[in-house]
């Protein structure tokens, strides 16, 4: 279901789940920001942006899990991107963000950029989160199924990018395929994942 409003407490729970994710010995996205709190604050800004833009969905009214995605040809306009951009600048430094951008470029072409260049349609997932009180109860599968169902309906793949091997392994377990790995040096690694659509009986040819 589409999320139309959230309390600041609910937004913070998503930010905290990201900012304080246990990366073990991996680097994770916090390397691009000024620590765990700054990462959590940036994610809160991201959530506010996708909420304003109408891109945020949840598993139920209880909000166990959330997913933000955009359909083919959808654009994230200024009202979506402005809070996200402000969140980046408030929780990092311009120097660090520039270094992060250079590291991404050196890491190679992303799956999203490759598909854009090839003019292939896809659903792009920008955020997946299960609130900490609901983790380990199967909600990650349920939240991903929201985007997967859209991919099946439209006949297009679902793609996303994640910042930890442990997260990547979970996505693979839940039906996605690893489509590429990018070494960002001191900023860690990024993993491209894809899930191809399953054809419905109506779409199958005899």
Describe the predicted segments one by one.
Residues 52-70:
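Conserved beta-hairpin
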Residues 33-56:
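Active-site rim helix/loop that mediates acceptor-substrate recognition in acyltransferases
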Residues 1-16:
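A short beta-loop-alpha structural element at the N-terminal edge
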Residues 130, 136-149:
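Conserved acetyl-CoA-binding loop-helix of GNAT-fold acetyltransferases
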Residues 66-128:
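Conserved acyl-donor/pantetheine-binding loop and adjacent beta-alpha core of acyl/acetyltransferases
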Residues 122-123, 150-163:
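Conserved GNAT acetyl-CoA-binding A-motif
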Residues 126-135, 159-169, 186, 196:
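Conserved beta-strand-loop-alpha-helix junction that forms the acyl-donor binding cleft
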Residues 141, 153-155, 164-181, 185:
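Conserved active-site alpha-helix within GNAT-family acetyltransferase domains
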């Amino acid at each position: 279901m589409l999320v139309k409003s959230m309390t600041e407490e609910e937004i913070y729970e998503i930010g905290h789940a990201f900012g304080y994710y246990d990366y073990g010995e991996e680097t994770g996205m916090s390397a691009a920001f000024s620590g765990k709190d700054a990462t959590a604050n940036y994610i809160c800004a991201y959530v506010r942006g996708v909420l304003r833009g109408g891109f945020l969905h949840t598993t139920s009214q209880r909000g166990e899990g959330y997913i933000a995605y955009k359909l083919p040809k959808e654009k994230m306009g200024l009202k979506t991107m402005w809070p996200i951009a402000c969140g980046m600048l408030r929780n990092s430094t311009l120097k660090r963000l520039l270094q992060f951008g250079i590291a991404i470029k050196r890491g190679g072409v992303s799956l999203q950029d490759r598909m854009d260049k090839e003019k292939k349609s896809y659903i792009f997932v920008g955020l997946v989160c299960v609130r900490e009180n609901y983790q380990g109860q199967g909600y990650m599968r349920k939240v991903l199924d929201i985007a997967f169902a859209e991919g099946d309906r439209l006949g297009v793949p679902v793609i996303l990018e994640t910042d930890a091997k442990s997260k990547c392994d979970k996505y693979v377990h839940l039906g996605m395929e690893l489509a590429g790995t990018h070494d960002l040096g001191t900023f860690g690694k990024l993993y491209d994942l894809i899930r191809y659509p399953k054809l419905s009986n109506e779409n199958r040819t005899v």
